[in-house]
A protein has these predicted regions:
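A membrane-interface helix-boundary motif in multi-pass transporters
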Residues: 222-243, 444-461
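Cytoplasmic helix-loop-helix junction between adjacent transmembrane helices
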Residues: 166-206
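Glycine-rich segments within core transmembrane alpha-helices of 12-TM secondary carriers
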Residues: 195-223, 245, 428-440
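Hydrophobic core of transmembrane alpha-helices in multi-pass small-molecule transporters
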Residues: 48, 145, 152, 156-178, ...
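Juxtamembrane intracellular "pre-TM" segments in multi-pass secondary transporters
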Residues: 15-40, 258-303, 325-326
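C-terminal ends and interior cores of transmembrane alpha-helices
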Residues: 137-159, 372-385
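Intracellular juxtamembrane helix-capping segments at the cytosolic ends
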Residues: 60-61, 176-192, 402-416
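Transmembrane alpha-helices of Major Facilitator/SLC transporters
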Residues: 334-359, 370, 374, 437
Length: 461
């Protein structure tokens, strides 16, 4: 695909006040690690607030489904629903857990199909109109989603299916595929090639930093709210989440406001924004011939992540049901698990990422090692008959998340800047579509294996 010399690419004019290292003929001066971190801070504080707010209701959102299922679907009494972890109600607990996994599969279905299709258009739009409109679209729809969840919490006796309505606005805006694409493309645009892995690592670390406090604050909000009423417990958590998302969104908009972008002149052959050929163009961009082995590297990176991310999504779809049935974990125990494992991840990454940057370790060698830790994690969890083994598995994988940051960095280095949106759209679409089938498979395996205690933990993972 030839580029018209008269048309500027997005990356050539997106950020007028940003200079890239490869454009400087002089040898850049070496910066201290601290200075390098300070100079690279842009949207990270806003992302921290948004991720902190998002983590507040992770456990409560699962617990409210359990409650609505228990009360509405099975018509159990409040006494039974409050004591499902009691051995006396083992059968009722299993019935509720099965329904939870079924609902989570429907949720995955609803939250994956539209974002998968939208990802292709978002990539093209990001290249045509810039990254900021995608940010605005996602953040607005995310706040609207949380508002609907808040209404469902206020009307606690309402059917759990009402919660599915909350996912519609964000899905139409592209879901988390839009968020991932806009963040990754934005960071790639404002970063020199040698800084991209470091910047992506910082983003991953920021995400992890938000985890421990958000889990504990969410647990405390739920606990103290429950002293007033069950309804107030859920409302307090979801209302705080909505407020945090709005504050983070405003900060993010303010931080990216100074980065200006002038749209390129429209090529007469350029696709209409909603043309089906946009999807075709995305596939052509990903699979087209490139110098050397660049195309092979791109496809290999996509394939590696597909086979790594599938079990992670499968695990996520059954994790709450798994710990609920096997260890009798609920809000407090799951919040503590999230906090402790996040702290370990933060400490490990806080040491590893700067050391990797200082030693200039080859990303191509580091990434396979990190993916191996992810595989070991699943193997250990497969035999986690005791809670401490479940913790151990997550500790082994404390650096695994950084492998995905390296993937993004390597992909962004293999394509032209004006193609970056389309390539990242393709990877976002792939990341969105595969959870559909894998979530269903894990749900069915969970329902079969939980009745056979000896193989329960092994088959579920």
């Amino acid at each position: 695909m030839e580029k018209d010399d008269n048309i500027q690419t997005v990356s050539e004019n997106v950020f007028e006040d940003v200079e890239f290292a490869e454009e400087k003929p002089a040898v850049p001066k070496k910066k201290s690690l601290f200075r390098r971190i300070i100079n690279n801070i842009t949207i990270e504080p806003a992302l921290f607030i948004i991720m902190f707010a998002s983590g507040l209701d992770n456990i409560a959102s699962e617990q409210i489904i359990i409650w609505k299922t228990c009360i509405n679907d099975f018509n159990f009494t409040e006494e039974i629903c409050d004591n499902l972890t009691n051995e006396t109600y083992g059968e009722e607990q299993g019935m509720v857990a099965d329904e939870l996994t079924n609902f989570n599969f429907i949720k995955t279905l609803v939250t994956s199909i539209v974002p998968t299709l939208m990802a292709f258009y978002l990539g093209a739009w990001a290249d045509m109109f810039g990254r900021k409109p995608i940010f605005y679209l996602f953040l607005g729809s995310y706040a609207l989603e949380q508002a609907v969840v808040l209404v469902c919490a206020y009307y606690l006796e309402s059917p759990k299916e009402w919660l599915l309505l909350s996912y519609i606005p964000k899905n139409l805006a592209g879901g988390f595929a839009a968020w991932t694409l806009s963040v990754n493309a934005f960071i790639s645009d404002i970063s020199a090639p040698e800084d991209r892995a470091f910047r992506f690592g910082m983003l991953g670390l920021i995400t992890k930093l938000a985890g421990p406090p958000s889990s504990q604050v969410g647990k405390l909000l739920f606990r103290y709210g429950n002293n007033v009423s069950r309804q107030f417990a859920y409302v307090s958590v979801f209302a705080t989440t909505l407020g945090g998302i709005c504050i983070g969104a405003l900060l993010l908009i303010w931080r990216i406001h100074r980065y200006t972008w002038s749209p390129p002149k429209k090529d007469r052959n350029q696709r209409n924004s909603f043309s089906l050929m946009v999807i075709v163009d995305t596939f052509k961009t990903v699979f087209k011939r490139r110098p050397g082995k660049a195309r092979i590297y791109i496809l290999v990176l996509v394939a590696i992540v597909v086979f790594s991310i599938m079990p992670l999504f499968g695990e996520f779809s059954i994790s709450y049901s798994y710990t609920f049935v096997r260890y009798n974990w609920q809000v407090d125990e799951n919040s503590d698990y999230s906090t402790i494992t996040s702290i370990v991840d933060i400490c490990a990454q806080a040491v590893f990422i700067p050391v990797m940057a200082a030693l200039k370790l080859n990303e191509a060698y580091v990434m396979p090692i990190l993916f191996c830790t992810i595989s070991i994690r699943h193997a250990v969890k497969a035999f986690a008959v005791e809670p401490w083994m479940y913790y151990l598995a997550s500790f082994i994988d404390c650096l695994g998340f950084y492998a995905f940051n390296i993937r993004q960095s390597m992909v962004s280095s293999l394509v032209d800047r004006d193609e970056l949106g389309k390539v990242m759209a393709f990877t976002s679409a792939v990341d969105s579509v595969f959870p559909i089938g894998i979530s269903k498979a894990y749900s069915e395996i969970f329902k079969v294996s939980k009745t056979k205690k000896k193989i329960f933990s092994t088959l579920s993972y």
